[in-house]
Amino acid sequence: VTGRPEARSPAPSPQPWRGAGHTPPPPHRVVLTITLGGVPQLRLALNQIDSRVGDIAGNADSVVRWTRHSAEQGAHLVAFPEMVLTGYPVEDLALRSSFVEASRAALRSLAARLADEGFGELPVVLGYLDRSESDLPKFGRPAGSPRNAGAVLHRGEVLLTYAKHHLPNYGVFDEFRYFVPGDTMPVLRVHGVDVALAICEDLWQDGGRVPAARSAKAGLLLSINASPYERDKDDTRLELVRKRAQEAGCTTAYLAMVGGQDELVFDGDSIVVDRNGEVIARAPQFTEGCVVLDLDLPAALADAPVGVVDDGLRIDRVVLSEAPLPPYEAELTGAYADRLDDDEEMYSALVVGLRAYVEKNGFSSVLIGLSGGIDSALVAALACDAVGAANVYGVAMPSKYSSDHSIGDAAELAKRTGLNFRTVPIAPMFDAYMDSLGLTGLAEENLQSRLRGTMLMAISNQEGHIVLAPGNKSELAVGYSTLYGDSVGAYGPIKDVYKTSIFRLAEWRNRAAAERGQTPPIPENSITKPPSAELRPGQIDTDSLPDYPVLDAVLAMYVDRDSGADTIVAAGYDAELVTRVLRMVDTAEYKRRQYPPGTKISAKGFGKDRRLPITNGWRESV
């Protein structure tokens, strides 16, 4: 897959409602200005932006554009997210010395470029990929191993570098596979304020740079982050930052990344709190922007601590400017962005993830098989909001088992959204196979699905669209899908969404459209009719599966929380049902391995954060 997106504009606005008949909300730029009361003052610019992994030149261009914007806002200190220069996560690119050296060279070039463009006096903090300068092996890694690093650029030079101290090695994170940890407590003195610097996990884990910031008597703790989205994580993040600010004893700024990378979504939601844990600024979710704050912070101490502090971290102090700025009047324009409710947040994450995957991989259009059911209808609505209805192509592929209402529901969806639509019956191909092979039962059912998959891939090859797979988490968990049939595609937008949430999101999307005076995109019949694959007469999903509320509750315990069979039964679920569902999950691992990537929105999706053997003799028993 090749291609490169167009250069990002300096202040893009989100477009969650692009598509026929859907008017996007008014664009807005995030510029928040706050004063706390006290001296000296510091205007901090937090650039909550997107990056594309591997596009070092494009990411550097973005840093320059947003630095220019920050300078226009009068910033005194500018910050960008974790590994913004390389994108995050870089995975095994970190093991390629050529990529590491390209990152290091780009950092030096960026420092010179910022100075050439007139921003040399403006200190810029950003993340990049570095390597250890140590001549000795460390933590079982050879000398010169990669580092997840941050840097301060000033006057055309790389003034200060530091590496992430706490390395996450859980869920989707494999940072111990790639990086060696940092052992310094970087403190930058700028305009008479000591600013302690941290990177993401340095806040999420106890110890390390948070207590070290207190020991160093910092006035501000600035953490640059690339922490992926999960449902309900925003509340956890807020409480974390509040707690760490109190532990550090200083104002704490948590700068987040925004955008998508393969299966991960970054939701923004940057936060600044005072030393007492009170929130003074919170940025929008899923939106690029620049948060500008006028902060009154404690003056740096003349005899500030030096040497080794908490967790063996050595204070690494760099003085840029001792003298405070002349007093100026701080303007308050607003500080707390509106929060999204749970359904809108989840839907927005799915839109951002899909849009990022399509655009960052150089595609401009998507192709979806439309059955008239709720899964393909929700995927179509997401696609219209992500890339615009004019770039969405839907194909209905009815068989002799397809109901009239399903065919009609697919056409109605196309009419409501304005997507491109065609109907191609599979009967001639199906009859040819049946005449040749005489298939019956499940083989006959799956043949229909595989013919549809073949047709979608043929159209994709001919017309250049990327195929979207409509499978949901409930179906993938129990293997209720057909390999090389409904599982074909390059991306699965609802791969990590349980069926019960599919219904809720569809209802929310329609309700949101109605509240805006727009046409609800999803036909009501697609939401209310019993789910069915329609591969045999009268078929409905509950012929093969428990009711979805029960199924999803069992799956949430087994898949998301790793509960055993005894624990699930003790929670009130029938032992025979639990045994059956768990066996279906275990024996479907080989199918899930062949499913395309898709947006991760839960704490544990079917991807890097759930790794089980295919050949596996272990079975849960009650």
Language model segments and positions:
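ATP/NTP-dependent adenylation/nucleotidyl-transfer catalytic domains that generate, transfer
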Residues: 40, 249-250, 275, 299-371, ...
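Ala/Thr-enriched low-complexity intrinsically disordered regions
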Residues: 2, 7, 11, 20-23, ...
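Enzyme catalytic cores with a strong preference for nitrogen-chemistry domains
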Residues: 28-369, 385-386, 421
